Amino acid sequence: MAGVSVIPVQSKRDMKTFVDFPWELYRDDPFWIPPVKSQVIQLLTPGRHPFWTFSRRELFLAMRGSEVVGRIAAIVDGHYNEYQQEEMGVWGFFECLHDPEAAGALFAKAIDWVRQQGMEFIRGPLNPSMNYESGLLVHGFESRPTFLMTYNPPYYPELVKLSGFRKEKDLLTYLSNRDTKPPEWAMNLGERLAQKQEVKVRRMNPKHFDDEVRLLTRLYVECWGDNWGFSPPTASEVRDMVNSIYPIMDLDLAFFLYVQDEPMGVCVVLPDVTPLLKRFNGKLGLGALIKKHLYWNEINGCRGFILGVKEEYRQVGAPLVALHYLLEAAKNKPQYYYVELGWNLEDNQAINLLYEESGLRPHKRYRIYRRDLA
């Protein structure tokens, strides 16, 4: 058997190989969801995605002879490091055959690259940051992921541990469906709190796109600013994100919450379009998928993509009010049988307990790993 070599991605052909590799790796896996290829290329390309205005990266391929056996991205997120006053390197976009030698060579190359950039530790998988798809699936392999959540083979956690990484944080998702019966006390309390605080709900207005993006950016920082691993996305990143998902957004499930005309929370629930991504195998962008009306009956669920409440409203029941509105809005859409919420940090006990007491059940668990470089 030929040995493993790791090479940097330098040409368009190399980039195509890097992007295409998961299609080979997962070709017999019924739960893998192909991403939209054009969006993957955009996300990975400096000059085409706003993330790279403040960050840098190197892409690598692992070869065994002439066969591609794995890939990885080594990243320095300059915005995060400035915001958190840390020297963090990142690994992401990792895919590999069940080949410990190849995985070890990829991680060694990523570690060496971020060390040369002056980083003190490396964290991952982040694709390319916590504001995007993050975490390695460690529990919940028996079903497909929802839209914009990661997926990987069950052997990945062992490959990561063999390269000297330790668990740093777990991310949790929760599931509700039409058979879920939230306790009556929770629903009644949510209604009473909404009335007492005079909570108002306003749907996002696409006619005022720039204003809505600015408000979403502001609330994202105010709602999540104290979270572990957080760095605020730039307005350009938020605008790019909204532009990318807008074709499939259900505007009945995208709203801001107000108390006395002060915005206090935001919720965006997206149709789980993974059946269509699977059907069209990454060849169609989201704008093209929306035109495939014949197949939209295959979409029977949704994902709580964004659900946040400002800190000063959390102790007066606002998270329960937001959850109440979300679940009721989804329930009023007969095409949606289930809604997945998350991810949540494992130690966000208040929100995780709220979900469980409201009848939601734990669904999937994702893990962020760390290795110190000193």
For every predicted segment, state its role.
Residues 1-31, 37, 374:
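Generic start-of-chain signal for non-secretory N-termini
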Residues 2-4, 150-229:
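Acyltransferase donor/substrate-recognition loop-hinge adjacent to the catalytic core
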Residues 15, 78-81, 130-132, 181, ...:
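Flexible loop/turn segments at secondary-structure boundaries
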Residues 22-65, 72-82, 208-308:
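A conserved beta-strand-loop-helix scaffold within acyl/acetyltransferase catalytic domains
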Residues 76-79, 278, 307, 353-359, ...:
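Alpha-helical subdomain
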Residues 82-164, 280-357:
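Acyl-donor binding region in acyl/amide transferases
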